[in-house]
């Protein structure tokens, strides 16, 4: 993967600074954050180019090992999207992405988003994450476009369908794979 591939994916006009037509100054890219798996393609090598455009690179949707996640942080990744979700689980011999929250190898510790909705994570997992790096802890929702819709089955991306049942969203045809959460706000 190259930066040109990212330009094709996101649109060059959205991922690069542009000139303001009124005063000729450089405007930052429209895209402010990219979440990607650092072990895929050539992504870790692209992190400095991404962050050099004032775009936050967030580790997520990943099978990255601790070493791969550490390399991403060393290259400029400053965030983890939805810690513990859609990523390699914590293992005692390879802590995966979670391991970069510890103080090691003089790397900065990234911020991390946690979905604390009672469905995505066990409360103890949330406490462990918070206690590992309280200054990096960010509460996020996994709210989706179905907010306010009645219970039912809805079309999603790539021909998949989502089942909305109360506040729980699951992917149709699976054994309850979490697809998101519907919430008004935190209590």
Provide a role label for each language-model segment:
Residues 46-50, 59, 68-187:
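Active-site-adjacent C-terminal substructures of enzyme catalytic domains
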């Amino acid at each position: 993967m190259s930066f040109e591939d990212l330009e094709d994916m996101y649109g060059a006009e959205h991922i690069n600074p542009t000139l303001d037509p009124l005063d000729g100054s450089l405007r930052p890219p429209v895209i402010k954050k990219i979440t990607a798996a650092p072990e895929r393609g050539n992504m870790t090598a692209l992190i400095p180019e991404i962050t050099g455009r004032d775009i936050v690179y967030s580790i997520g949707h990943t099978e990255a090992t601790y070493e791969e996640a550490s390399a991403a942080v060393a290259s400029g990744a400053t965030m983890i999207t939805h810690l513990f979700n859609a990523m390699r689980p914590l293992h005692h011999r390879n802590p995966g992405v979670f391991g970069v929250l510890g103080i090691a190898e003089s790397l900065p510790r990234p911020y991390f988003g946690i979905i604390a909705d009672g469905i995505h994570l066990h409360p103890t997992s949330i406490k462990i994450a918070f206690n590992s790096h309280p200054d990096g802890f960010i509460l996020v929702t996994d709210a989706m476009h179905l907010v306010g819709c009645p219970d039912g089955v809805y079309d999603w991306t790539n021909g998949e369908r989502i089942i909305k049942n109360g506040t729980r969203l699951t992917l149709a045809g699976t054994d309850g794979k979490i697809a998101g959460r519907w919430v008004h706000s935190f209590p």
